């Protein structure tokens, strides 16, 4: 992660990509219990598909204070990089952030075909391995 290059040499950096949520929380609680300043740096925005609630609950239970700094989602970042707008007057004023069902099922009424029927901007996350399904659902929605 590029942001870690600004960490002081005295900082302990831990790559959590191979850790479970329980292991991450245990590590954070352990360091916080030693009165260390702990930062959990994530890509994107932790409040969007970031397991924020699941992470905060054990920290709250352990008495670890939590502060969340919002990030930039890939939907917003990609629009900025392309110098595009996600909304356009008289075309769409609505943006839906969603994903397709994979390991985690989608709630009733949130199927991609149903969402696409609104003909607004869709930012589709966590679905790169399901592109065939995304394409089929979008085509079926018209």
Give, region by region, the residue ranges found by the protein language model.
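Structural motif
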Residues: 17-18, 100, 125-129
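Conserved anion/nucleotide-ligand pocket segment
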Residues: 105-142
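Residue-level signal for well-ordered alpha-helical positions
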Residues: 6, 81-82, 137
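Class I S-adenosyl-L-methionine
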Residues: 1-72, 77
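Class I SAM-dependent methyltransferase SAM-binding "motif I" and its flanking Rossmann-like core
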Residues: 43-118
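Generic beta-sheet signal
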Residues: 36-40, 95, 120-124
């Amino acid at each position: 992660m590029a942001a870690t290059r600004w960490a002081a040499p005295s900082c302990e950096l831990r790559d959590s990509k191979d850790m479970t949520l329980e292991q991450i929380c245990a590590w954070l609680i352990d360091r916080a219990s030693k009165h260390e300043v702990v930062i959990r740096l994530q890509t994107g925005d932790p409040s969007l598909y970031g397991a924020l609630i699941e992470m905060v609950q054990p920290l709250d239970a352990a008495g670890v204070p939590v502060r969340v700094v919002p990030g930039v989602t890939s939907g917003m970042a990609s629009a900025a990089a392309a110098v595009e707008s996600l909304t356009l007057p008289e075309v769409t004023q609505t943006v839906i952030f969603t994903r397709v069902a994979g390991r985690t099922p989608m709630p009733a009424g949130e199927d991609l075909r149903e969402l696409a029927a609104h003909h607004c901007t869709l930012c589709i996350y966590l679905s790169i391995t399901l592109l065939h399904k995304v394409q089929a659902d979008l085509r079926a929605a018209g």
